[in-house]
Amino acid sequence: MKTISTNSPLPLMVGFGGINPAGRASFHHAYRRLVIDKLDQEKQDGTFASLAKLMRLDGNSQDSTVRQYIKDHTLIRKIEIFDPDAVNWHSSATLKNTDAKSITFKIPTKQLPETIPSNWSLTKINDKETQIICEESLSVLLPDERVSKVTSAGQVPSGFDPAALYASRSHPRGLQLTVYGASDAIQSTGFKVEELRNLVRPDEISVYSGSAMGQLDNDAYGGLLQNPLIGRRPTSKHCALGLPEMPGDFVNAYILGSVGETAGIIGACATFLYNVKRAIDDIRSGNKRVVIVGNSEAPVVPHVIEGYRVMGALAEDEELKALDDSDICDNRRACRPFSSNAGFTCAEASIWLVLMDDQLALESGARILGSVPDVFVHADGYKKSIPGPGIGNYLTVAKAMASAKNLLGEQVLRQGSFMQAHGTGTPQNRVTESHILN
């Protein structure tokens, strides 16, 4: 295994921030929401006050009713971004005349298709309407609504609207979260944007970010792919704003004003780590001295939820009811990483790090939060199912532990360290990750 040279720069984390279902990430606000019942009174008060501001609540954050509302409208819960009880759908149907004669109807002339079906006969009624006689059956799509079989997701706190915080101009939700998340991370360093940028030469700062899913809502790829099928036109923004590397482009253009290197590396749930690896490799080699790195995802849209559901990856409501032997789906407990579970839960978030080399961090007086000495990501080799677990997880953990032992010694590794579980909530992950962590 390659070891880290004692002469190479050490990547240090000098800022982090973003937004996720627990709230604002900087200064551990989101983490405190996760463990809020175990905090002392002062920290609880501060956490509730922060969330109340984020959620634009008018009530006093000290009030028990307001606090219960905050608890109920953060973390994993029933989907609020769209109505899971009325998901738009199209049902295909074949229309036939009841008396076996041709089908006759009229429509506005401007709504006629560009290619007239061969079995249609057209008669102009007036300047605005046309009568159509269809000699055979007519295939149509009927607007419909369905109840989603998955109604749980991790969503940013209710009331938080990233689009209201800047001139969003119909930006996809993932990019709206990017602007907030990256801004939060950069401001957490204590440096103004200009100060951070001026610490180094323009080619010594870079931004690495991506989105595994890309932007799939109606303001990006969702609109690009769906609009022609529902009688609308794609817009000039749909294609460009859907690109997976767009979060990094937004940071460069809207926040940092950087002309330095940029890249977007994509890798499913390891996308964030792929970009962190690129960042630390550049810092250790001396090519970069400041790197802003992050990931932004907004997959809580009906077609993405349905796509993961038909894979068998998500916890469906009926499966959760069966686990609890209940007639009611407990949306709050949809994700159960190391328990009896049925699948993972989609969530939206935008999380960012600001990394510096150790010399620059000391010279600039930056607040040092920790180091990121290495990142390991391994493929699984031959396997029958791409989504299934494989040997790569074992190699990744083994190399990470060897790196920690090399840096800190075996005693610290065994007695002074901890492992943060992946914990997706899928039955396969429950088995393989439990085996690795044992």
What spans do the regions from the language model cover?
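Conserved catalytic cysteine-centered active-site region
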Residues: 4, 129-176, 214-278, 311, ...
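Short glycine/threonine-rich loop-to-helix capping motif typified by GTGT followed
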Residues: 381-393, 423-438
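Conserved small-residue
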Residues: 182, 207, 272, 279, ...
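ACP-dependent fatty acid/polyketide chain-elongation machinery
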Residues: 1-167, 359-371
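Active-site-proximal alpha-helical scaffold in enzymes
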Residues: 177-191, 244, 248, 262-297, ...
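Condensing-enzyme catalytic core mediating Claisen C-C bond formation in acyl metabolism
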Residues: 7-17, 21, 319-412, 417-418
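Hydrophobic alpha-helical hairpins/lids featuring a short glycine-rich hinge
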Residues: 175-235
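Short acidic, glycine/serine/threonine-rich loops at helix termini
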Residues: 218-222, 275-277, 301-307, 366, ...
